[in-house]
Every structure is written in C-alpha cells, then in structure tokens.
C-alpha cells in the first residue's frame, strides 16, 4: 500500500480537499486504484451535530455516516463509495482508545497520547486503507490522506506525531507528503512572497515531516523565479506533479501505470464548461444562504446538470426568512430584494433543513413556484413544505402543518414518521397531488409530483449526494432542463444527454415502489433502475 498525505500551512481554507481529490484523479488516471481518508482534529465523533455555519455541509455516506464535506469531494472526483471509517476525528480515536482501556485491552498500563493514541491513529489508517471503495475486489493501490486544519494547530499535534511515525512504519517509497501553502501577493509591491511558505515548511520539518511536493495557491499563476526559489529553499521538485508522486512512491516503472495520466474526459468537460454562454438561473431558498458550503453537494449537482444541458449556472441565494410577511415590516429592503429574485427565477430549489426558522418563507417559495408554473425541486424539508402548501392552498386546510413545527396542529399533513401522513394521502391524491414514489410498505412517501405542472417534484431522500461530474442526478437534470426549456428534448428516447445516475442514496429505503404516471417518469425511472427498486 502506498500513501499520499496532504497537509496545509499558513492559513486554513486553501483547498486541501480539492488538492487531495485532484491528486486522486491524476493517480486514478494513471491506472491506479485509489482510496481516501479525511482526518478532522476536532473532538466531535462526527459532523452530524455541527451547524452548517460551523463546518459547512454534512455529507451523508451510503452507510449513513455523517461526515465532513471533503468526503463528498472525494466521492464526486473519484466516483467511489466511502464509509464512515474513512473520516477520522479526534473524538473517534479517543473513544476507541477509552473503550479498549475499559475492556482491559491494555492490561493495566497507563494510557498516554504516545504511544496509545498515536498507535490507534496509525492502526486505523492501515485498516481502512485496505478496504476497496471502487466496487472491485482486493485492496486499493494508493490511499490519499488529508489532514484537516493548519500545521501548528494544537489539536493536530497527536496526528502530526502519528503520521511522522507512520512514514517510518511504512518505509521509504511508500509515503509521499504534499504540503498545500499560500503564496500571497502584497498590493503595495505586487510581488509574490515565498516567506510564508518557507516558514510553514520549516515548521512542518520541525514536527518531523518533510514535504516531497508543494501545492501553492496564489491569486495568479506562480512566476518562474518564484517556483525556482520555492524549489531551492524548500527542497522540492518543480512542476510535473504526477511524475514526482510516482517517483517518490516508486511507481514510475510499474507496468500497469502509464507515463501520462489519461485525463481526456476531464479536459473535455473543462473545455465545455469554459465555452458555456447561455445561462440558467436557479433560485436557492434556504436558511444557511450566508455560507455556500452549507449546500455544497446541491450546488455541485446543479453544476453537473447545467454542464450536461449546455447551460452556464447562475445561482441566486434567497434567505427564506426574507420572504416572510414579518420581514416586510422588519427588513423591508431585504423582503423586496428576496421577492424580486424569486420572481426572476427560471427554476426554484428548496433544499433540506431542520427547525422552524424560515419555514414559512420556504412554503411561500413552493406556493409561488406552483402557482406560476416555475420548475421546482424540493429536497427533504423542501418536499414537506410543498405538501404543507398544497394542503393549505388547494385543500383549504389553513392550519395544515408539520408536527415538527406545530405539535398540536389539527391537520398534521407531515408527521415524524413516516413523514407525509399516510392517513391524508387519499385526500391529497384526490386533490391532484401524486405520490409517485413509496417504500415497500406503501406508508412512507418518497416522491411527490404535480402532474398538471411543468416540473414540480419533491423527494424525501437526498439525490445530490449521488451526482457526479459525468453522471448528473436525473432529478437535477430534469430541473435544469425544465428551467432552460429543454425538458421535452431530454425526455426523447434519442436524447444523447449523459445517462442519469441510477443509484439512490441514504436515507431512501432499501426498496421503493415507483408508480409511472406521466412522460416525466422516463427521467425519474432512470434514477431507480437498480436492484433495490421495484417498478410498477
């Protein structure tokens, strides 16, 4: 097993996750099987309870693991399926060690950071790195490890020590360190400065790790003299990253590894993206709109679909609170701006969320889309609020609500389990709302559709987690197609649009009964074309 460690210096937010994912893509394009591990030094055992404002989106894996958003990047870039064990946190490591101590596994020894915590980290990495993630038998060839945070952080120290030991454990030729750093440009002189990177590398070396490669971020491409200076003072080669990595890992002469990575698919996709001119405007209505990373997978799914449909994506962010009637009095300018953006939408998307703040604004967004025939996609809570709006507006149940927001509502159209109240489903369907996807018991409503509408879909699950650059989610593909006037073309049997991704993602049940009702079904049908789904 070969290991590539990606660390970061100078400042946080430099793009270690994208760097790690890109390295994985290049190695995969060289013919190697790649897996990934993300290390998060925080004490939480996982990201499930963290606010999106704290850490961005919580990405959900096939096994239900709630993890850092970088694992979503890995899955999208490499088209792999990871598990919760691919995300290591300080909380998980300490919890594992304490559990072993309570069982007596350490035979009465004093438990210390070194060696017990550091050994646990190394053992965890070695164990998880051997698990195949690409659907094939046998262990991967290379494991790319990303260490979260910045070199010098106190909370990262046990991991730095463990990884230093780990480089000796696996031996020369099996460990490559890529350090991501910042090369700032001072406006006063307009010169690219290398000192921050030099100091970061010196600090890394002082902790027992020496970088083999530098990945430098700057506002402009690095000048040749800057590259030469960094190469000289930090003792790293200049350019040709894949060759440098293969050389450090003793892989450059392995028979199955081509000298040049095959990146034609990626370069063609990038070229297509750069040439896009016609736009499609999607309005995102949510409560965490102040931080785009809160909806990262949704944004990526929209981007994948937009490129596939030949459109340049324009996303307008609307805080759901600003749409509410109370905002007209409290923040009139924000209220006016929010409604102006909503009314200029070519498509409306209401993503998942929880809590009652801003819910009324989301209901109003769904109502506007329904009444004005604007393409609409509601995900999780976005589906539930569409049901609430339908109950209030069409079925004349003004008090209709979710028991999450009003436990005493007289018309509980959404309940804790199974969500949409199954007792009210016949009334909904009689009024014109179709429940086209259900679980095998027929009680859990998974997909709603408004047959009289151009495109009005709500889903209880999260299709954004399965979208890939070359295989966009069909539900997002449908939204973009409807918003750009291409839905009929997309639904033609002869359509050469990229094939929809057929795999649903947690938390959709193991079996979903899909009831075909209208032409749009051919799009949604493709989403459920796998062994876990029953077609009727």
Regions found by a protein language model. Name each.
Residues 49-52, 229, 391-394, 451-452:
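Short low-complexity, flexible loop/linker segments enriched in glycine and/or proline
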Residues 45-47, 223, 327, 388, ...:
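Short Asp/Glu-rich motifs
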Residues 15, 382, 460:
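Conserved phosphate-binding and hydrolysis motifs of nucleotide-dependent enzymes
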Residues 55-59, 396-403, 451-461:
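Short, structured secondary-structure boundary patches
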Residues 61-72, 232, 401-414, 446, ...:
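Short, basic, helix/turn surface patches
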């Amino acid at each position: 097993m070969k290991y590539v460690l990606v660390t970061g210096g100078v400042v946080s937010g430099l793009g270690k996750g994208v760097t790690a994912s890109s390295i994985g893509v290049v190695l995969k394009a060289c013919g190697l099987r790649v897996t990934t591990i993300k290390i998060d030094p925080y004490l939480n055992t996982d990201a499930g309870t963290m606010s999106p404002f704290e850490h961005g989106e919580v990405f959900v894996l096939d096994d239900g693991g709630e993890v850092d958003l970088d694992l979503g990047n890995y899955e999208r870039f490499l088209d792999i399926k990871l598990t919760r064990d691919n995300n290591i946190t300080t909380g998980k490591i300490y919890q594992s060690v304490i559990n072993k101590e309570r069982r007596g596994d350490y035979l009465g020894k004093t438990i210390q950071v070194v060696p017990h915590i550091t050994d646990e980290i190394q053992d965890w990495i070695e164990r998880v790195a051997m698990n195949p993630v690409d659907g094939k038998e046998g262990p991967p060839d290379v494991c790319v490890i990303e260490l979260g945070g910045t070199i010098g952080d106190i909370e990262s120290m046990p991991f730095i020590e463990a990884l230093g030991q780990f480089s000796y454990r696996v031996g020369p030729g099996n460990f490559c360190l890529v350090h991501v750093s910042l090369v700032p440009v001072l406006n006063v002189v307009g010169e690219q400065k290398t000192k921050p990177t030099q100091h970061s590398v010196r600090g890394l070396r002082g902790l027992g790790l020496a970088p083999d490669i530098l990945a430098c971020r700057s506002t402009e491409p690095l000048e040749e003299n800057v590259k030469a200076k960094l190469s000289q003072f930090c003792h790293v080669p200049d350019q040709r990253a894949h060759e440098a990595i293969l050389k450090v890992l003793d892989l450059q002469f392995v028979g199955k590894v081509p000298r040049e990575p095959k990146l034609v698919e990626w370069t063609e996709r990038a070229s297509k993206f750069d040439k896009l001119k016609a736009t499609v405007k999607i309005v995102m209505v949510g409560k965490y709109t102040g931080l785009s990373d809160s909806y990262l997978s949704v944004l990526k799914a929209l981007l994948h679909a937009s490129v596939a449909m030949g459109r340049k994506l324009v996303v307008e962010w609307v805080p759901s609170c600003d749409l509410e009637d109370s905002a007209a009095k409290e923040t009139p300018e924000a209220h006016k701006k929010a409604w102006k953006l909503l009314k200029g939408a070519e498509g409306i998307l209401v993503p998942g969320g929880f809590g009652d703040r801003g819910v009324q604004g989301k209901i109003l967004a769904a109502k506007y889309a329904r009444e004005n025939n604007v393409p609409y996609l509601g995900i999780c809570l976005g589906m539930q609020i569409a049901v609430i709006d339908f109950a209030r507006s069409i079925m004349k149940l003004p008090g209709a609500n979710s028991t999450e927001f009003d436990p005493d509502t007289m018309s509980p159209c959404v309940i804790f389990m199974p969500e949409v109240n199954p007792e009210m489903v016949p009334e909904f369907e009689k009024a014109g709302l179709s429940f086209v996807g259900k679980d095998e018991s027929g009680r859990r409503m998974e997909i709603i559709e408004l047959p009289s509408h151009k495109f009005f879909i709500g889903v209880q699950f999260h299709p954004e987690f399965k979208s890939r650059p070359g295989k966009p989610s069909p539900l997002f593909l449908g939204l973009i197609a409807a918003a750009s006037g291409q839905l009929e073309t997309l639904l033609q049997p002869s359509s050469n649009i990229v094939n929809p991704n057929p795999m649903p993602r947690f938390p959709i049940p193991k079996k979903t009964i899909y009831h075909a009702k209208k032409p749009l079904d051919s799009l949604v049908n493709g989403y459920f074309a796998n062994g876990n789904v029953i077609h009727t």
